Every structure is written in C-alpha cells, then in structure tokens.
Amino acid sequence: MMNFRQRMGWIGVGLYLLASVAAVYYIFEISQTYNRLALAQVEKTSGAQAKWPGDASSSSPSSTSWIVTLKTRLLLLPFWVWATIFLLPYLQVFLFLYSCTRADPKTVGYCILPICLAVLCNRHQTFTKASNQISRLQLIDT
C-alpha cells in the first residue's frame, strides 16, 4: 500500500513529464520566434564571411547593443553545451521527484548529485575514521 508521499511523488512525476512534453512541443512545433531565430542563424553562418556584432570590422559598432552580441554568441554554442545546461537540472528535478516515490523516506533526495556526493564523501570519512580507530586499538592492545 502506498502512502501519501508516494502518491504525491507519482503525481508530481506525471505532471513534470507532461509539462516537459508540452514545453518541447511548444519549442519545436508552435513557437515561430524559435524558428525565425534558427533560420536567421543558419543564414548568418552560411554566408561567406560571418561578422561578430562587436567586432571592429563591422560598419557601425556602436549601433549593436551588448544584448544582441550576447544573444548571437550564445546561439553559436554547440549543441552539447545547451544539452548539458538544460538536461542536468531537468534530470536532477526528475530524479528528486522519482525518489519521492520510494517506500523508505530516508532515501528521498539521494539521487540529487550534490546530496549523493555529500553522502559518498561522508561514508568515506566515516570509513577512514573507523579504520584509524581500529588501528589505534590494535596498537594499544599490543
């Protein structure tokens, strides 16, 4: 029998996945802004000479703002950088919601990377302390 926390965890997982599918559908099917930005970026990079908006070779460097320059440079980042930026937090939230569906409440949150690293480091320190105490006891007993 599932308790209330587990039921809410499964509802949270379902809603999170539903919202994710809706967001991906909106970005890749509905949003005309994304399509225009993608086409403009392809047209810029397919040209013979790509100019940076902040370069000295551009015709009027003061006419472009730093926001346009930043937006242009961010669009030039490779796909794996964007995938890492968006997938790491997405997976962390998903794993936290999934860990809420576990029967043992002590294991909630162990899937989150910082908590997982803290638990592993704490176990390593505890093991080191225990082995040092055992070696001291052996020295005292002899």
Curated annotation (Swiss-Prot):
<dbReference type="Pfam" id="PF15190">
    <property type="entry name" value="TMEM251"/>
</dbReference>
<dbReference type="GO" id="GO:0060627">
    <property type="term" value="P:regulation of vesicle-mediated transport"/>
</dbReference>
<comment type="function">
    <text>Required for mannose-6-phosphate-dependent trafficking of lysosomal enzymes. LYSET bridges GlcNAc-1-phosphate transferase (GNPTAB), to the membrane-bound transcription factor site-1 protease (MBTPS1), thus allowing proteolytic activation of the GNPTAB. GNPTAB is involved in the regulation of M6P-dependent Golgi-to-lysosome trafficking of lysosomal enzymes. LYSET is thus an essential factor for maturation and delivery of lysosomal hydrolases.</text>
</comment>
<feature type="transmembrane region" description="Helical">
    <location>
        <begin position="8"/>
        <end position="28"/>
    </location>
</feature>
<keyword id="KW-0812">Transmembrane</keyword>
<protein>
    <recommendedName>
        <fullName>Lysosomal enzyme trafficking factor</fullName>
    </recommendedName>
</protein>
<feature type="transmembrane region" description="Helical">
    <location>
        <begin position="76"/>
        <end position="96"/>
    </location>
</feature>
<dbReference type="GO" id="GO:0007040">
    <property type="term" value="P:lysosome organization"/>
</dbReference>
<dbReference type="GO" id="GO:0000139">
    <property type="term" value="C:Golgi membrane"/>
</dbReference>
<keyword id="KW-1133">Transmembrane helix</keyword>
<keyword id="KW-0472">Membrane</keyword>
<dbReference type="InterPro" id="IPR028024">
    <property type="entry name" value="LYSET"/>
</dbReference>
<comment type="similarity">
    <text>Belongs to the LYSET family.</text>
</comment>
<dbReference type="GO" id="GO:0005794">
    <property type="term" value="C:Golgi apparatus"/>
</dbReference>
<keyword id="KW-0333">Golgi apparatus</keyword>
